[in-house]
Amino acid sequence: MKILMTGHTSPIGTMLYEHFKYDIHGCSRSNGYDLTQLQDIEKIVERSLQYDHFLNLAHVGTAQTQLLHLIHRHWTANNKFGKIVSFGTLGTELPLKVLQSLKTPMEYFTQKQSLEALHRRLCIEKPFGPQPQSILIRIMNYGVKMGERSSEPTCDSMDVIRTVEHVLGDPCYVSSIDLRKI
């Protein structure tokens, strides 16, 4: 299994990159891919044909949504049927008042909502038969929290690894997973 991914230098990405290290190639600014530049996004899209699956983790503006759209379209045109796993957030489901208390820029949630909307369209575009599979993993509270949030349950690296292994290895089309501890 060969995997191409963006976001391999982020906390979740680093952990996934290390876990799959013999079968994965990361694309980031550190190795020549600037996800704010369309020509670099297009290079990733073209390169993705050489891999079995794509992990779409890097949140750089609208790059995640662009990559999902362009890779899905490119794979469809080339009869490639791998899995495109995008990472969202369950934060998009939280009430506005809670979101504002998190002090995360609202633009982040707007961009993740766009990613989710595109995923919902692509995952049912063709109900049956061979096709690229858009998979969305939405995570709530990854990593240890500090201060007033220190008592919140959080997902750890093994939770994410198990989930990614599940969606990549399962013969069924697992379209969406909401991952959180309660």
Regions flagged by a language model, labelled:
Residues 2, 52-53, 83:
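Structural motif
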Residues 3-21:
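N-terminal Rossmann NAD(P)H-binding glycine-rich loop of SDR-like oxidoreductase domains
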Residues 22-46, 59-66:
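Adenosine-cofactor binding site in Rossmann-like domains, unifying the SAM/SAH pocket
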Residues 55-63, 88-91:
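Conserved NAD(P)H cofactor-binding loop of Rossmann-fold oxidoreductase domains
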Residues 59-84:
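NAD(P)-cofactor binding segment of oxidoreductase domains
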Residues 76-127, 144-147:
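Catalytic loop of short-chain dehydrogenase/reductase
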Residues 122-142, 173-176:
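Conserved Rossmann-fold SDR core element
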Residues 149-182:
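C-terminal helical subdomain
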